[in-house]
Curated annotation (Swiss-Prot):
Interacts with ENV10/SND2. The keyword Transcription regulation does not apply. Residues 510-521, 551-579 have a biased composition (Polar residues). It is found in: Cytoplasm. This is SRP-independent targeting protein 1. It comes from Saccharomyces cerevisiae (strain ATCC 204508 / S288c). Signal peptide: none annotated. Residues 369-414, 446-521, 550-579, 773-815 are annotated as: Disordered. The keyword Cell membrane does not apply. Residues 389-402, 805-815 have a biased composition (Low complexity). Residues 470-501 have a biased composition (Acidic residues). There is a cross-link at residues 668, 670 (Glycyl lysine isopeptide (Lys-Gly) (interchain with G-Cter in ubiquitin)). Present with 195 molecules/cell in log phase SD medium. The gene is SND1.
Length: 877
């Protein structure tokens, strides 16, 4: 009886001891941008006891590992992506493998973890038999990515090596179930422990591509562990009773990112949070959340803006969410001109502009912003102050800020526009008491003066903690984290300093958004009334007119100046009749001119300055926009004296002037022999050469000179020679003769003519090729193109008759034209001049004409006489 009573008393004592144990809770740990979520019903007792004493009925242990990192899972293993190296650096799962192995036992230290596995092996060795084995099931659920194989291999081989002896003794049923893809399965079959593979205790679940699994399969890592945890958190399963009655232990380990943690908190939102998650984990989550918010706040307020796209876009995205990842970068060839940078001055601290209307409207709509500035407003305020080293446009540090020009020096040499800017700044300061923007600036300035010391301390501490260097503005920040190296590489191209150029980005809430409706006003009076609201220069880059909701209309009416000085000044013509989707305006929207308000300036100075402003603001097209490939001497050889274009133009001019005379022989001859008209005698400078008292203003008029000399040609019938006096042909056409009679004619004209008319006869060969010769002559030329010697057919009388009939009014002098100036040109000329004789009796003695082989003188080396001719490769001049 005493023994029975003693055993009952011992059992009651053990129940009270183990009843003081804590209930199962979820623990969360963060490491390397990843989170380790652990749930286990292995309860830790207040009084230390062995695993066999705590769980006398234990027969099964389930270890469930879920790897859910969507950033990695959605990339295929076979895909080569430029961000994979960055992902591998950020999500280094192999750094968590020791923590994952320790989480299987739900222990806090490595010593407790080793003690747990030793006690479990002792429990299996003492209780299990080949007939009654202990079950150890390990499930690894993931997307099967290659980025997980090293960690999975480490965990599986560690468990196998620990329980290999018990498995050989047939006291343990060891089973692994691993989700793999075809690529990761190939890797495991190659690099996993050969002994483990030969035992065939691993059940490979080939899920294929993870993207296909998302579409087709209902079993995903997130859904699986969500369901498991939900079952553990239900009320019926939460009261597991005494530990001595437990036969199965579950250990759920989840590796995920911040998205998975948010999903867990959403899952626990319907339950008392403190009863399901450990107090240490709640504290750790709060610290992590505060650190993230602090980093975001520091990025918005303390981090200086750099002259690169990523820094400015990050700042804009925090203010205006509609312009994310949209960077507009505009560079102009005329960016260095004074007219483009006259209305903006750059200091060492910031780029300052004149106050605009948008800030006034913003302040008027948000009155609470002036009374109690919010955190975002304070962050924006820190960017707008000069000490922030911002390279973006600032609009709130205008009226009360000191002069940005040190020692009276300006970045631009245009002192006129600088005086105008000073005048505008003085007028804005004079109207400070009547404008709302002054109140806003006063508040900001007071806050700035009070908090400047504190902000400098915060900036110093922030720089000391994170390694930022605010003095080096162009160098960029160097992070100590591995995952930011690729970000720096992406921004290297945009990190170059551009001292001369300016970069305009997508407009944010700080930029001035002007509208063409500000210009379209009913009259001068209304514009004068609204001058306080619309006065001030700005520069905006927008795609649409915010007021009209359509592309900007750049057609503005010319405002009439009320004073005499404005009326006497040149009219300003800046209107254009086209619409554009990019609107850049730099000028006053009101009709009044701030320069005219200065009474101490003379009208001449005002006119001079207004003309300078009109010239600067007038739209112009730069010649630099024309690519150099469109300016080529080969494509535009019209500057050459003997080019084909100039020759054809001269011939067309002559043909148009004497078209009627070419069709009537009698009128043509009468005109050529007629005296010089009286008005021509008075106007022509050629007739006044002997008069020393006359003023020869038009002595070099080539048009009059050419026509005077043309009318003084009594012997050479130019039109019957060059333009074919055969009336059967079209008189308006350039009906040039074939080469042989033309060469003879022109050679004779050059030798015997005493005047300067031979220059008009110096025609190129391509002008002769483009002539309207007879069809038979064209056939003869085509047939003899490839031959070296082309004999004139003496038996064919028609060939000679046609040539002679067409040259009835030509002198019998011999003409010679050396187009190529070759060595054999003399012999060729002798044969030609001797064989061809022209007379009024149409009798001709012909000899074989030796035609030169077709050659192409590309660079004009053989053409010594034609020094002004255009050849391939450039002008010879």
């Amino acid at each position: 009886m005493d023994t029975v009573g003693t055993d009952a008393a011992a059992a009651s004592i053990n129940e009270r001891r183990f009843a003081q144990s804590t209930s199962p809770k979820v623990s969360v740990k963060s490491q390397d941008s990843l989170f380790l979520i652990t749930y286990s019903n292995m309860q830790q007792t207040v009084v230390q006891a062995s695993l066999a004493d705590r769980y006398p009925s234990l027969k099964k242990l389930n270890i469930l590992l879920y790897i859910d990192i969507p950033t990695i899972d959605y990339y295929n293993d076979e895909m080569t992506h430029n961000k994979l190296s960055r992902l591998n650096k950020r999500f280094k799962l192999h750094r968590l493998r020791n923590s994952i192995a320790q989480s299987f036992s739900n222990t806090s230290t490595a010593e407790d973890n080793d003690k747990f596995w030793e006690e479990l092996k002792s429990l299996i060795s003492s209780r299990s038999t080949p007939e009654n084995k202990f079950d150890l099931n390990v499930l690894v659920s993931s997307s099967g990515s290659l980025r997980y194989v090293e960690t999975i291999r480490f965990l599986v081989e560690k468990l196998f090596n620990s329980f290999k002896d018990l498995y050989v003794q047939k006291k343990l049923n060891l089973c692994f179930q691993i989700n793999v893809s075809p690529t990761s399965l190939k890797w495991f079959s190659t690099f996993l422990n050969a002994e483990l593979l030969n035992l065939k205790i691993i059940n490979w679940q080939n899920i294929g591509s993870f993207t296909k699994t998302i579409q087709n399969s209902k079993s995903l890592p997130f859904k699986e562990y969500y369901t498991k945890l939900n079952e553990k958190f239900t009320g019926s399963n939460q009261s597991n009773g005494s530990m001595q009655d437990q036969t199965v232990l579950d250990s759920i380990v989840i590796v995920t990112n911040s998205t998975g943690v948010k999903a867990l908190l959403t899952l626990l939102s319907d339950h008392p949070l403190t009863s399901l998650i450990s107090q240490e984990s709640i504290k750790a989550l709060h610290e992590y959340s505060d650190a993230v918010n602090e980093d975001k706040g520091d990025d918005q307020s303390n981090t200086s803006l750099k002259r690169n796209s990523s820094s400015l876009l990050n700042f804009q995205n925090s203010v205006l969410t509609s312009n994310k990842d949209k960077s507009v970068r505009i560079r102009s060839l005329s960016i260095n001109r004074k007219s483009n940078r006259a209305h903006m001055f750059k200091t060492n601290e910031s780029i300052t502009t004149i106050p605009s209307t948008s800030i006034n409207n913003l302040i008027g709509q948000e009155s609470n912003l002036r009374k109690q500035p919010s955190g975002t407003a304070l962050h924006l305020q820190s960017h707008l102050h000069p000490h922030s080293r911002s390279q973006s446009y600032s609009s709130s540090n205008m009226s009360r800020s000191p002069s940005p020009f040190p020692y009276g020096k300006t970045p631009s040499n245009d002192e006129l526009v600088y005086d105008e800017l000073n005048n505008q700044i003085n007028e804005v300061q004079d109207r400070a008491k009547n404008e709302e923007i002054v109140l806003y600036n006063n508040n900001n300035y007071d806050d700035y003066t009070k908090e400047r010391g504190e902000q400098e301390q915060d900036r110093t501490s922030y720089a000391d903690e994170y390694g930022f260097n605010y003095d080096d503005e162009e160098g960029g920040n160097e992070d100590n984290y591995d995952d930011d190296e690729d970000d720096d590489d992406d921004d290297d191209d945009d990190d170059e300093s551009d001292d001369e150029g300016l970069s305009f980005y997508a407009p944010s809430i700080l930029s001035r958004s002007g509208s063409s409706t500000d210009v379209l006003s009913s009259g001068i009076d209304s514009m004068a009334k609204n001058s306080k609201e619309t006065r001030g220069r700005f520069r905006s880059l927008s795609l649409m007119d915010p007021a009209l909701q359509k592309p900007f209309n750049q057609k503005f009416p010319n405002s009439q100046q009320p004073d005499s000085a404005g009326a006497s000044s040149p009219k300003r013509s800046t209107s254009s009749n086209h619409f554009t989707n990019v609107y850049v305006h730099d000028g006053d929207f009101d009709g009044t001119d701030t320069i005219n308000n200065k009474k101490n300036l003379s009208s001449a100075t005002l006119i001079k300055r207004k003309s300078l402003m009109n010239r600067n603001l007038a739209p112009s097209i730069s010649n630099g926009l024309i690519p150099p490939e469109f300016i080529s001497r080969i494509s535009t050889p019209s500057t050459s004296a003997s080019s084909s274009n100039s020759s054809l133009n001269d011939m067309s001019t002559v043909s148009n002037a004497f078209s009627k005379l070419l069709n009537d022989t009698s009128k043509k001859q009468k005109f050529l022999n007629s005296p010089i008209p009286q008005h021509t005698q008075q106007a022509s400078p050629l007739l006044m050469r002997n008069n020393s008292n006359s003023n020869l203003l038009f002595e070099k008029n080539l048009i009059n000179k050419s026509f005077e000399e043309l009318r003084r040609q009594p012997s050479v019938n130019l039109f019957s020679t060059l333009m074919n006096g055969n009336m059967e042909k079209n008189g308006l056409a350039l009906n040039f003769k074939s080469r042989t009679p033309t060469d003879a004619l022109m050679a004779n004209s050059i030798k015997n003519s005493n005047n300067s008319s031979h220059r008009l006869l110096n025609l190129e060969e391509e002008d002769q090729i483009m002539s309207g010769s007879l069809p038979k002559e064209r056939e003869d030329d085509n047939d003899s193109t490839n031959s070296t010697i082309v004999p004139n057919h003496p038996d064919n009388d028609n060939y000679n008759d046609n040539d002679n009939d067409n040259n009835t009014g030509i002198n019998s002098n011999n003409f010679n034209l050396n187009l190529y100036d070759d060595n054999d040109s003399a012999g060729f000329t002798d044969v030609t001049t001797e064989g061809v004789k022209y007379s009024n009796s149409n009798s001709t003695v012909t000899k074989p004409v030796y035609k030169k082989a077709v050659t192409l003188d590309l660079y004009g080396e053989d053409d010594m006489d034609n020094m002004g001719g255009w050849v391939l490769g450039g002008n010879a001049r």
